[in-house]
């Protein structure tokens, strides 16, 4: 068994496996920006693009594409996630996917080494039957992807943050708050908005949203009906919202953040690290994170047409544990060109009818099994896992056949083939059987892994 590791961010542990040979692509860091790129075998005009090698990380790619070339490439928000690995190969949602789609949708060309040691240059013109599987079929599954070429996009003019919280003073007012927010949701289910709304057992909603190509004044006008409703119920809610807007060109510019919003980032001060390396402070909690429970689900757009019913579902689920609703990790409401590109990938088609994605997780940091003083409390872990299971069972029961994002899913998902890939799975399995019949590449809940015993 051969396992591929890029940066090792996989939530399902697909970048490692027992009794296997591990290939680590960390030092393959070449990045090349193209003004006009024509995929191999193509006879059409070129498009702006970037080629990234297997060990490239998104911060390095954004530096080349945005800071130095004035373009945007659809990638991940966490700066240390790999740009040529499981993120793209597993579809790849980011904060701006309602505008730009998934990372896989931007793939123009892939260089892949198959199990029989054959080097293939895959595009929509050459080996087109590999095009879909590499665009969303999962990392470390069909071969070793040594480099990818991704379409780049015109840079948005502005980037904004919409951050705050609303606390309801009773269960009744919290249920009504959820309903009112879901009533309002269509106003932000579009290509301008992304990121999260968090619901908690403490009757609190946290808003951590981003927006693009809107001014602060436009955002204020969009949300004013919701603010007016809150103001009409001063005895029921305490709330505070901050709106900020910055030039999009500075999204990945460490000097801009250090000068203007230093509390939002963490500069990498370790000796010998590349200049300009940083991560978002909100990602601190992911360092050495030990998961007790991790479950997720797409929420069909049709459910948003009945806000009262969906509010009851969300309220009941929030009694067990907090969860986040991601605006940008679903494609109903996304820009048409982004949707058109993603329909050519092998992502579960149910995503096109989903208006949001929900994640419920319970975890701790600084937990290390086998190290005295840092061992997990098993009883505590099981109690939190049970809370996550109980809360997500309510959401799953309300969303049969909704499907899920394969990169961020329950490790124990029982019907993973259908949940992750829907009716695309037979095609994926056929490609797997053709290029890797002996299952040289096999990871947890990857295409064909059910045949590995």
Predicted regions span which residues?
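Soluble FAD-dependent oxygen oxidases
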Residues: 1-453
């Amino acid at each position: 068994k051969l396992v591929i590791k890029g940066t090792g961010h996989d939530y399902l542990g697909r970048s490692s496996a027992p009794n296997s040979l591990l290939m680590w692509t960390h030092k393959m860091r070449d990045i090349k920006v193209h003004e006009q790129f024509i995929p191999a075998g193509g006879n059409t005009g070129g498009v702006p693009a970037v080629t990234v090698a297997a060990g490239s990380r998104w911060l390095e790619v954004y530096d080349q594409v945005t800071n130095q070339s004035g373009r945007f490439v659809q990638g991940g928000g966490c700066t240390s996630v790999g740009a040529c690995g499981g993120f793209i190969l597993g579809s790849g949602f980011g904060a701006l996917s309602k505008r730009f789609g998934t990372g896989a949708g931007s793939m123009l060309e892939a260089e892949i080494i198959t199990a029989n040691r054959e080097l293939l240059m895959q595009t929509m013109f050459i080996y087109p039957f590999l095009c879909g599987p590499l665009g969303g079929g999962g990392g470390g599954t069909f071969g070793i992807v040594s480099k990818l070429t991704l379409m780049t996009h015109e840079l948005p003019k502005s980037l904004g943050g919409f951050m705050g919280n609303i606390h309801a003073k009773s269960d009744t007012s919290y249920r009504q708050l959820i309903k009112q927010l879901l009533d309002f949701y269509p106003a932000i289910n579009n290509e301008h908005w992304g990121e999260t709304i968090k619901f908690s057992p403490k009757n609190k909603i946290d808003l951590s949203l981003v927006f693009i190509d809107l001014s602060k004044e436009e955002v204020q006008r969009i949300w004013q009906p919701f603010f007016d409703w809150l103001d009409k119920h001063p005895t029921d809610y305490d709330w505070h919202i901050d709106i900020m807007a910055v030039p999009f060109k500075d999204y990945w510019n460490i000097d801009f953040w250090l000068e203007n919003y230093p509390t939002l980032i963490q500069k990498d001060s370790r000796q010998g690290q590349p200049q300009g390396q940083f991560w978002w402070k909100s990602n601190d909690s992911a360092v050495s994170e030990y998961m007790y429970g991790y479950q997720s689900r797409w929420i069909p757009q049709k459910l948003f047409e009945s806000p009262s019913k969906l509010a009851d579902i969300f309220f009941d689920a929030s009694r067990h544990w907090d969860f986040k609703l991601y605006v940008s990790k679903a494609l109903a409401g996304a820009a048409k060109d982004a949707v058109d590109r993603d329909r050519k990938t092998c992502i579960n088609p149910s995503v096109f009818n989903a208006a949001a994605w929900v994640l419920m997780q319970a975890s701790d940091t600084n937990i290390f099994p086998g190290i005295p003083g840092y061992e997990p409390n098993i009883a505590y872990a099981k109690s939190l896992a049970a809370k996550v299971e109980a809360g997500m069972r309510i959401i799953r029961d309300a969303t049969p056949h909704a499907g899920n994002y394969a990169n961020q899913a329950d490790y124990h998902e029982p019907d993973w083939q259908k949940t992750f890939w829907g009716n695309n799975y037979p095609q994926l399995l056929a490609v797997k059987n053709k290029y890797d019949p002996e299952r040289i590449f096999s990871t947890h809940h990857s295409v064909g892994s059910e045949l590995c015993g």
